Each structure stands twice: as structure tokens, then as C-alpha cells.
From Swiss-Prot:
Residues 33-77 form the EGF-like domain. Disulfide bonds join 37-52, 46-65, 67-76. Pfam families: EGF. GO terms for biological process: epidermal growth factor receptor signaling pathway. It comes from Manica rubida. It is found in: Secreted. Its main location: secreted. This is U18-myrmicitoxin-Mri1a. Belongs to the EGF domain peptide family. Residues 1-32 form the signal peptide.
Length: 87
């Protein structure tokens, strides 16, 4: 019986983490009014012409990048082969 409680508790924690991540992704992708990053982050965080923005989630500042066309990844560090830049 105790093993079943452990499985249920583990599943509940998994659901809580999953829904938290979904909320963060939704906020960062759908919120049109992002605050700009502080200069020390803006210069170092985003690569390949990406634009740094910050979103406050549950009292914590989170820094992300909006990538220039042709790039993707958390820091715009990867070439997006599905959308190459015309040269």
C-alpha cells in the first residue's frame, strides 16, 4: 500500500512540474509586452542578432531571446535549417 502512495505522490509532482513548464512556455511565447533585458544580459545572452527580453514569472526574472530569422535555440545559437536566411 505504501508503494502505491509513493507512485501517486511522484505522479502528482510530475503533473505539477509539467503544468508549471507549460505555463512558462505559454507566457514567454504569447505575451506581446516583454521588458528589455538589462544591458549586461542583452549583450551576452542572445547570439546571432537575437533580441533579449525578460519576463517576470512568480516574482523571478527570466531572460529569453527572440531569434533573428534563420536561427533558433534558447540563445539563438543554432542555425534553423527549416528557415534559412536568404543571402
Amino acid at each position: 500500500m505504501k508503494n502505491n502512495y509513493n507512485r501517486i505522490n511522484t505522479f502528482i509532482v510530475y503533473l505539477m512540474v509539467t503544468f508549471s513548464l507549460i505555463s512558462i512556455i505559454s507566457i514567454t511565447e504569447c505575451t506581446p509586452n516583454h521588458d528589455p533585458c538589462p544591458p549586461q544580459y542583452a549583450e551576452a545572452l542572445c547570439l546571432n542578432g537575437g533580441t533579449c527580453f525578460s519576463v517576470t514569472i512568480m516574482g523571478s526574472d527570466n531572460y529569453n531571446c527572440i531569434c533573428a530569422p534563420g536561427f533558433r535555440g534558447w540563445r539563438c545559437q543554432e542555425k534553423d535549417l527549416d528557415h534559412p536566411v536568404n543571402q
